[in-house]
């Protein structure tokens, strides 16, 4: 080779950062590379020259120069030469066992030892295994069992137990170690230097055993210092890089959790996909061949699963197959024990463990070698078990795998909890749909009912009496649907609704009123009649949409009323109170109204434009909500102030809404404006409901207010007096001020107030209050069809 070419080669090496020292250091750590290079690339003649040169030196002794390089207890020079190599090895996931073996080779040179043995902890950290490096051409590193960690056996076991360095000049004469080193060449060994390899946080990871043969000088304290310094440096270096690995793994885990969270919230229905995502990461986390996730059925004391890792891959990702669900007793197997005890189990040999349940292997055709089984705990209870099967790199799962998996198991609990919660929600939705289907069937009128209403004819006498404010629908129960059709046609015109849809709607509304004493179908038609009378006596004041909306709102304003007040539902956390925090029943009534409108053939507003449809629904909503008596007091006060100051303007929508709200209250309370016998009978119905609510409160140990206490029925007249003065009279007074044609309501209310005062005084009240209009006719009534033209 010419000088020019030689210079070019050296320059190239320098450019890449290689130095003679780094190459030598690498070859010291990798003697097999040198062996292969020599055997393949160096001629026999050259080897002979090397051998002749070598015979001039002691064959078993390292050169003084080589020894001195590693005898500095601060590892000056060696650290700098090997640091980048070691970090590179560790950063790329290099085998710590092999790396420590290579470093042990350096320590052997530094201490002039004849040989060494490197031990690592066994599967359960209670035994030692001697490390056998790979062969020159092929083969994998091996760990050969060397016995349990206990005193009274070998020096390595003794040091592992005590975690203290031992320097023994003559091991064969030391009674503490009856088995000596336990190595095959132990009879030639005399002096032993045995050191524990401990991490920076105090965990024992291995034992280095250096020895010298018979006839050699025994190890001394300086050798111990050199070896200790080397191991300390190596332990710190490895720990530092492992910490970095751990941080990288934590970052990876955090990224994974964010990814899974995004997956879950973006596609909440794909629970199987979420579980697959988790199981894939869990496999990679501990380098397992298979993964299984079992959920716990505490009711039946079983474990079950329907998602299985079949060991195949597609585009580099494991395939999970959803099959028929398998179940087995919680009393069986390793997974069963983990589910029962909540303890982590790390089984190095599954078939040697009597707890292993072979049924799953028989079912799947898979052979299980080792298992890492972790409980998934939520709210102090085991809700699932994650089982990692067959460690890929290594003979079994390690303690590090356990620690990493414990951290991951916390998120598994969250994911599994979400999965179970979603499953329950889906199950509840199915029950809900079935229930709604049944409810729909039983709450929709029959064809006979709505067709009968279409053919119904209303007596002429009733048509005349309907126009009166104090008209009582009570005696005409079979005619109530027809009465409402008549009022709709009189107020809004016969073509305002399709007759078939209107009849369907009315009869289904009737069916959805419950059989409670007061808030029932009769009350609905009574309130609708009062609104009809107000609209008829204030003709031209309200739009067509308002007239339609208000009459429908009155008919539906107490739909599905259960006979209990809002305060009762809220006090005892009724589901309706959870749905509607304010105006609970009123919001439910509106919701039921919309539900009926959405039934097939029931949408009486289907001919309206979309904007008109929204308007009429809003009119109905506001009107029904206004029947919440808690809202009445503030509304009436505002209207009274507007009226007194002259600021009330019915062209202002907010003012108009307030007036309509007062009209709804007046209609809802209209029983106080009927003839006295009707008013008194209706009061009995109202109190029947109040007392039923009071009885329920008493059952729960709560004393109801006097109005709801049947034991205080003697206080009813006094209570009515207070109600009239505080609520009814002010309501009709303000309404009369704004809408003067409604004055008959105020007059009738005052007459009934006088009747209650007479009751309190003990006077006879068995009389009818005279009212406008003709007396009921005793003649045979003329028949009129409900479809009356204006």
From Swiss-Prot:
Residues bound to 3',5'-cyclic GMP: 519, 720
Swiss-Prot/TrEMBL induction comment: Down-regulated by the expression of a huntingtin (HD) gene with an expanded polyglutamine repeat prior to the onset of neurological symptoms related to Huntington disease.
Primary location: cytoplasm
Expression by tissue: Detected in striatum (at protein level). Detected in testis and brain.
Cofactor: a divalent metal cation
Active-site residues per Swiss-Prot or TrEMBL entry: 519
Catalytic class of the enzyme: hydrolase
GO molecular function: 3',5'-cGMP-stimulated cyclic-nucleotide phosphodiesterase activity; 3',5'-cyclic-AMP phosphodiesterase activity; 3',5'-cyclic-GMP phosphodiesterase activity; 3',5'-cyclic-nucleotide phosphodiesterase activity; cAMP binding; cGMP binding; metal ion binding
Keywords assigned: Allosteric enzyme, cAMP, cAMP-binding, cGMP, cGMP-binding, Cytoplasm, Hydrolase, Metal-binding, Nucleotide-binding, Repeat
Domain of life: Eukaryota
Hydrolase among keywords: yes
EC number, UniProt record: 3.1.4.17
Gene Ontology biological process terms in this record: cAMP catabolic process; cGMP catabolic process; regulation of adenylate cyclase-activating G protein-coupled receptor signaling pathway; regulation of cAMP/PKA signal transduction; signal transduction
Chain intervals for the UniProt region annotation (Disordered): 768-790
Residues holding a divalent metal cation 1: 523, 557-558, 668
Coiled coil: none
Pathway noted in the entry: Purine metabolism; 3',5'-cyclic AMP degradation; AMP from 3',5'-cyclic AMP: step 1/1; Purine metabolism; 3',5'-cyclic GMP degradation; GMP from 3',5'-cyclic GMP: step 1/1
UniProt keyword annotation of Iron present: no
Subcellular compartments: Cytoplasm, Cytosol
Binding residues annotated for a divalent metal cation 2, in chain numbering: 558
Function: Plays a role in signal transduction by regulating the intracellular concentration of cyclic nucleotides. Can hydrolyze both cAMP and cGMP, but has higher affinity for cAMP and is more efficient with cAMP as substrate. May play a critical role in regulating cAMP and cGMP levels in the striatum, a region of the brain that contributes to the control of movement and cognition.
Family membership: Belongs to the cyclic nucleotide phosphodiesterase family.
Annotated protein name in UniProt: cAMP and cAMP-inhibited cGMP 3',5'-cyclic phosphodiesterase 10A
Organism taxonomic ancestry: Eukaryota, Metazoa, Chordata, Craniata, Vertebrata
């Amino acid at each position: 080779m010419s000088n020019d070419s030689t210079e070019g080669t050296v320059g190239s090496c320098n450019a890449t950062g290689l130095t003679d020292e780094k190459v030598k250091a690498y070859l010291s750590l990798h003697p097999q590379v040198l062996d292969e290079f020599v055997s393949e690339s160096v001629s026999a003649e050259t080897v002979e020259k090397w051998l002749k040169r070598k015979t001039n030196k002691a064959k078993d002794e390292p050169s003084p120069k080589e020894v001195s390089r590693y005898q500095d207890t601060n590892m000056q020079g060696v650290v700098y030469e090997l640091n980048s190599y070691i970090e590179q090895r560790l950063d790329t996931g290099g085998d710590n066992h092999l790396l420590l073996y290579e470093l042990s080779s350096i320590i052997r040179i530094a201490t002039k030892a004849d040989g060494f043995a490197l031990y690592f902890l066994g599967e359960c950290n209670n035994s030692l295994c001697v490390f056998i490096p790979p062969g020159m051409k092929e083969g994998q590193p091996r760990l050969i069992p060397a016995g349990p960690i206990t005193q009274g056996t070998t020096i390595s076991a003794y040091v592992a137990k005590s975690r203290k360095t031992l320097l023994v000049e003559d091991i064969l004469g030391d009674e503490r170690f009856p088995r000596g080193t336990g190595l095959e060449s132990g009879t030639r060994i005399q002096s032993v230097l045995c050191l524990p390899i401990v991490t920076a946080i105090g965990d024992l990871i291995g034992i280095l055993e250096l020895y010298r043969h018979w006839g050699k000088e025994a190890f001394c304290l300086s050798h111990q210092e050199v070896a200790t310094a080397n191991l300390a440096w190596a332990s710190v270096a490895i720990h530092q890089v492992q910490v970095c690995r751990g941080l990288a793994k934590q970052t990876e885990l955090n990224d994974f959790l964010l990814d899974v969270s995004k997956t879950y919230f973006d596609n909440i229905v794909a629970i199987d996909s979420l579980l697959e995502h988790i199981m894939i990461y869990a496999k990679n986390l501990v380098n397992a061949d298979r993964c299984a996730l079992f959920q716990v059925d505490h009711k039946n004391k079983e474990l079950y699963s329907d998602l299985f890792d079949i060991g195949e891959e597609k585009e580099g990702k494991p395939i999970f197959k959803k099959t028929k669900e398998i179940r087995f007793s919680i009393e069986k197997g390793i997974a069963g024990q983990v589910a029962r005890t909540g303890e982590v189990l790390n089984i190095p040999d599954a078939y040697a463990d009597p707890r292993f349940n072979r049924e799953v292997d028989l079912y799947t055709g898979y052979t299980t070698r080792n298992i890492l089984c972790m409980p998934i705990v939520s709210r102090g209870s085991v809700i699932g078990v994650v089982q990692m099967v067959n460690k890929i790199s290594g003979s079994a799962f390690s303690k590090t795998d356990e620690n990493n998996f414990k951290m991951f198991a916390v998120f598994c609990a969250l994911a599994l909890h979400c999965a179970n919660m979603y499953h329950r929600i889906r199950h509840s939705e199915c029950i809900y749909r079935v229930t709604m289907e049944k409810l729909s069937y039983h709450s929709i009128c029959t064809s006979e009912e709505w067709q009968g209403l279409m053919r119904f004819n209303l007596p002429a006498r009733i048509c005349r009496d309907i126009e009166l404010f104090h008209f009582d629908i009570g005696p005409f129960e079979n005619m109530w649907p027809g009465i409402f059709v008549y009022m709709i046609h009189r107020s809004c015109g016969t073509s305002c609704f399709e007759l078939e849809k209107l009849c369907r709607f009315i009869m289904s509304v009737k069916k959805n009123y419950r059989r409670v004493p007061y808030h029932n179908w009769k009350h609905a038609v009574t309130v609708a009649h009062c609104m009809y009378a107000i609209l008829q006596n204030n003709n031209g004041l309200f739009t067509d949409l308002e007239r339609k909306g208000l009459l429908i709102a009155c008919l539906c304003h107490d739909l599905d009323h259960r006979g209990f007040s809002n305060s009762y539902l809220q006090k005892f956390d009724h589901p309706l109170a959870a749905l509607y925090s304010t105006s609970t029943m009123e919001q439910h009534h509106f919701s039921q109204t919309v539900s009926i409108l959405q039934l097939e053939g029931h949408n009486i507003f289907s001919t309206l434009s979309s904007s008109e449809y929204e308007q009429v629904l809003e009119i109905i909503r506001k009107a029904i909500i206004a029947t919440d008596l808690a809202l009445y007091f503030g509304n009436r006060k505002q209207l009274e102030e507007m009226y007194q100051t002259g600021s009330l303007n019915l062209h202002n929508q907010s003012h108009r809404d307030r007036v309509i709200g007062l009209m709804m209250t007046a209609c809802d309370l209209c029983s106080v404006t009927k003839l006295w016998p009707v008013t008194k009978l209706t009061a009995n119905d109202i109190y029947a409901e109040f007392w039923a609510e009071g009885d329920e409160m008493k059952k729960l140990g709560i004393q109801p207010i006097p109005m709801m206490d049947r034991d205080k029925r003697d206080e009813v007249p006094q209570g009515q007096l207070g109600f009239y003065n505080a609520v009814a009279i002010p309501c009709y007074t303000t309404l009369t001020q704004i809408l003067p044609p409604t004055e008959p309501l105020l007059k009738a209310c005052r007459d009934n107030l006088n009747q209650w005062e007479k009751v309190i005084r003990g006077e006879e009240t068995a009389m009818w209050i005279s009212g406008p209009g003709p007396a009921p006719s005793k003649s045979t009534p003329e028949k009129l069809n409900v479809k009356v033209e204006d």
